[in-house]
């Protein structure tokens, strides 16, 4: 990133974060929500004002707290990204599937990326959680497996 960022570039970046078709959440080290983009609002039904300052675990009881804390601890300690694929862990948050093409799935399959966000001191102070909707890929993989099984029968 350049040393100086023009103010219009900041506006572009904010627009991108809001409009991009992935979930973006920024959490502090106590798992309190600091940033919540429109993808998250649309799929959770919760607006930024409703979630800001609340812990992710209080908002979504279905989150495997021990699992997520282990992943975040690794991100903080190593200062590197961590990933979770839908094949290993189908979802972080149980969102309904709203895709008409893949409507046969009850919930959204998700890939998750955890990014360390360092403060001015260089220490990781926040975590960015990026959620990708993988429902179409999951559905296609299941359909392919079913077709292959049927062809062997």
Predicted regions span which residues?
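Sensory coupling linkers of modular signal transduction proteins
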Residues: 116-152
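Hydrophobic helical signal-relay modules used by sensory signaling proteins
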Residues: 12-16, 104, 143-153
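Sensory modules in modular signal-transduction proteins
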Residues: 4-43
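Per-ARNT-Sim (PAS) sensory domains and their PAS-associated C-terminal
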Residues: 66, 77-125
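Amphipathic alpha-helical regulatory segments at dimerization interfaces
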Residues: 62, 71-78, 153
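Short, charged amphipathic alpha-helical "coupling" segments at sensory-output junctions
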Residues: 1-12, 137-146
């Amino acid at each position: 990133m350049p040393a100086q960022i023009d103010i219009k570039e900041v506006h572009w970046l904010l627009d991108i974060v809001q409009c991009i078709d992935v979930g973006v959440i920024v959490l502090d080290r106590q798992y309190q929500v600091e940033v919540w983009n429109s993808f998250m609002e649309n799929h959770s039904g919760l607006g930024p004002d409703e979630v800001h300052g609340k812990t992710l675990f209080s908002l979504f009881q279905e989150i495997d707290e021990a699992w997520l804390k282990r992943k975040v601890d690794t991100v903080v300690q190593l200062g590197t990204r961590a990933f979770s694929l839908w094949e290993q862990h189908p979802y972080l948050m149980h969102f309904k599937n709203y895709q008409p093409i893949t409507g046969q799935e009850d919930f959204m399959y998700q890939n998750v990326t955890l990014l360390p966000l360092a403060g001015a001191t260089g220490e990781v102070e926040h975590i960015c959680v990026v959620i990708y909707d993988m429902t179409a890929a999951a559905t296609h993989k299941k359909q392919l497996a079913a077709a292959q099984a049927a062809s062997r029968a």
